[in-house]
Each structure stands twice: as structure tokens, then as C-alpha cells.
Amino acid sequence: MAKDIKFSADARSSMVRGVDILADTVKVTLGPKGRNVVLEKSFGSPLITNDGVTIAKEIELEDHFENMGAKLVSEVASKTNDIAGDGTTTATVLTQAIVREGLKNVTAGANPIGIRRGIETAVATAVDELKAIAQPVSGKEAIAQVAAVSSRSEKVGEYVSEAMEKVGNDGVITIEESRGMETELDVVEGMQFDRGYLSQYMVTDNEKMVADLENPYLLITDKKISNIQDVLPLLEEVLKTNRPLLIIADDVDGEALPTLVLNKIRGTFNVVAVKAPGFGDRRKAMLEDIAVLTGGTVITEDLGLELKDTTIDALGQAARVTVDKDSTVIVEGSGGKEAVANRVNLIKSQIETATSDFDREKLQERLAKLSGGVAVIKVGAATETELKEMKLRIEDALNATRAAVEEGIVAGGGTALINVIEKVAALDLTDDAATGRNLVLRALEEPVRQIAKNAGYEGSVIIDKLKNSSAGTGFNAANGEWVDMIDAGIIDPVKVTRSALQNAASVASLILTTEAVVADHPAPEAPAAAPAMDPSMMGGMM
């Protein structure tokens, strides 16, 4: 395919147009008075959301060069979401600010490599200062505040804090759709382990790339499955029940994996295969935990059991299993309560006699997975559109809360970024590196400027007053008052703010140092088909 190529200022300006289109669409959602964006879906009702990464992923531009710029910013939002789970709109706003001001300097003759060096130094200093002013998060009330700020809903904050209280900060919390209009919290027995599906073709939801299995059987073994004949009799038995199957094995390879995938694609059989968690003796113990939880038997040579002789009676069962590319969650295993309790007591006794901290830590992880359960937030709403929007807000709140517990919190509403300006400004840099530092100084103001604008205030006035206020004092855009942000519950997780700044600076620097852009040449449109001749006009030809 032929390529179109642009160079220097022409290349950068084309990409920046794409950056601006995407950022201008996303940044209207920032802050307590941010607006929503309506996304057209190819099927079903439109999605109304204020989630930055969801909006960014939907944007495709007709111009290939502009689209590349938009996609780079979308990558900033996605990466920030992957690392911190929130802060995607802030990351987008920061990227646009650095790129926009940086382009002016590069066009005026500044060296982009020097600018990049200054940006990196300034961002590193800002991140260090954010960590230094962070406050730890503890207690149900603080957790509820973080979740409430992220979701813009005190009710959501209560659900998230209650869920984390019941299953622990590192516990498994899932979000489901409720059949009613009310949102409620359930805690059900379950287990999560860090192994995902062996093939992406096993997913049942192509949009979220997850496999949801309702009422599945579980084959649990420490053997490697390479020959499909070893499990064929068992597969035929399960197929008759019309229920899905989760295979947990040492590995599934050879002819076995493509055969399972082919049957899944054809719709013959709903099956998902994952590798067994852990290694060595710890793997055997974890498989036994899963077997006890689900009422199954581990198919292992230690017990003299072979795959080819396995019957459906040896399989575990669960109400639901969810598998993504990285993890598996088993909910409501069918194992007896007494058997689970005995297993829990066994692990507790092993913890007491463990001689190394490492062994004790791993045993405590197993205990948490076996006894902690899974908290399920069931989201209810009046319409499907509201339901989708509510789920996205709760997901953001959950991610932000975990980030806050991990690295602490700072004053929210962009205040913390203003508070670190003094440290960044004090950096002794020269020439183009100083220009890069100044770009970051300007960008650090941008989230506050946009939050104020969305709330109907003049951003420059707010920023000027912020710079002359004591650290932690900020502007509450929801009601127009000046408050101590942390006391008022307007807080951001350090991990979210830090990730947004680091990812924005990284991609913005790459755009500024771009000298050539290569894009596919648009394919010519196919000629329109000639209109069919009216049969009545053929009379003279007969």
C-alpha cells in the first residue's frame, strides 16, 4: 500500500490537531461540574459517560495524521487507567498542555531533545514532591471519601468502602448488573488467582475480553494436557449436561488447545483453559484449595488418578467463574462448608508453625483467598444507559481507592499539582532544558484551569490565588468555596496524579521530538455500480 509522508512542522502540527480534537472532547468531563459525552454504539442505546479513557478509545479521525496524534493521547489515557485505574482525563489535559506549548517553542527553533530532557527532569522532581506531601489512607471514612470524589457520588463511596472493609484492601471486588433498580452489596464466597485464559478466542465478551462461565464444571489437575484423547471421554460427558467447563491444568498445549478453541468458536462447547496457579509444592496446595472450595478432586499421580479415567463426579462446580487475560475468579464454589472450614484451620496451623516470612506470607495469601470471599457490588438503575454509566463510575472509584491505599493521598482538584510548582520552578536548568521545565510548570496549572472553566469560573484568577494560599488549601469548584481540601474530603490518590503526569510527559515528549510521520495513503473509493437498465426500454432490441 502507498504511504503519505509529512516532515517537520507539517508533521507535528497534523498530529497536534488530532491531540486537540481528542483532548477537547475529553476535558469537558473534568471536575465536579464536568459534563457528559454521548457515545454512539453500533448496537444498543448510546453510552453517556464522563470517563476519559472510555471516550478516548471511541475516537477515530478520518485524517490519518490527525488520527495518529489522537491515538497517542488515547494511549496516555489507557496506560494511566491500567496503572492507576483513574486520572485519565487529567492525563489527557496534561498531555495537551505540554504538546501545545512545546510545539510553539520547537517551531520557534528550540531543540526538541533539550526540551525533552527538561521535561523529564521537571516531572521527576514533581513526582518526588507529590510523594513527599502524600498522606496515608486508613479507615472506612477516608476510603469512602476517595471513592466519592472519583465517582461524584457519596453513595458509591459508601458501597466501595463497605466492600473493602468486608474483604480487605487486597480482597476481590467485582461489579455486576442488578436485576432491580437499587444498587446493593453482596459478599459471596470465592477465590481469585493470577492466571488468565490460554487463548483469547475463549472469551465470551469481546468488548471486555473476559470469559464468563455460569454454573460451570471445573477440571482440576497438575498434569499437562497435550493429547485431546486423554480428556475426550470426560468432555463428552460434560457436553451432555450443556454446562461450561473450566480446565485448570499445568498447561494445555499440543493438539489439545487448538481443538478446544475450535470447538469453542464453533459453539459446540463453552470451555476455558487456564494454567494452575503457583509453582512446585505450593501449586499442589493451591489446587487442593480450589478442589475443596468447589467440591472437586485434584487429578494427580500422587493419588493414582489419570485423566483418561476421570468422570464427571471428580469435577468441581461453582455458581460462576470469570476469567480475563491475567486472572480467574471462582464465585460460590460447591464445596461443603465443613470441608472448607477444615482446610482453613489447616492453613492457620501451618501459618503458626511456618519458619520463614516468605512461607508465612504465601500461606496468608491462600487463607485470604479461601476465607475472604468476593464482594459483589450489584448496580441497579432505571435504564440501560444509566446502568452502563453507573458501572463505569463505580469501577473508577474502586480503582482510585485501591491506588489511594497503596501510595496515599494528596489534595484533590488539581491543588497538589499547584503545590509542587515551587519545587519544580527552583530547578537550575539552562537553555532548552529550562524551556522543557517551563512547559511542565505551565501544564501543572492546566487541570485547575479546566476544572474552574467547567464550573464557570476564570481559571487564571483561581490559579493566582492558589499559588498564594497555604499548601492544601484549594478551590471547591462544586460550591465556589476555598477550603482545606483534605478536611473537605476533596482528595486524589498520589498514584493517580503521579501516573497521569508521568504518562502525559512521556507521550508529549515523543510527539515534540517527531520529525517525520508516515501514514497509509487513503484507498480510492470503489466506483459506483451502473444502474440496472429498465426492461421496458429493451423493447426495440427484442
Swiss-Prot record:
GO terms for biological process: protein refolding. GO terms for cellular component: cytoplasm. This is Chaperonin GroEL. Pfam families: Cpn60_TCP1. GO terms for molecular function: ATP binding; ATP-dependent protein folding chaperone; isomerase activity; unfolded protein binding. Together with its co-chaperonin GroES, plays an essential role in assisting protein folding. The GroEL-GroES system forms a nano-cage that allows encapsulation of the non-native substrate proteins and provides a physical environment optimized to promote and accelerate protein folding. The keyword Thylakoid does not apply. Keywords: ATP-binding, Chaperone, Cytoplasm, Isomerase, Nucleotide-binding. ATP binds at residues 29-32, 86-90, 413, 476-478, 492. It catalyses: ATP + H2O + a folded polypeptide = ADP + phosphate + an unfolded polypeptide. Forms a cylinder of 14 subunits composed of two heptameric rings stacked back-to-back. Interacts with the co-chaperonin GroES. It is an enzyme of class 5 (isomerase). It comes from Streptococcus mutans serotype c (strain ATCC 700610 / UA159). The keyword NAD does not apply. Its EC number is 5.6.1.7.
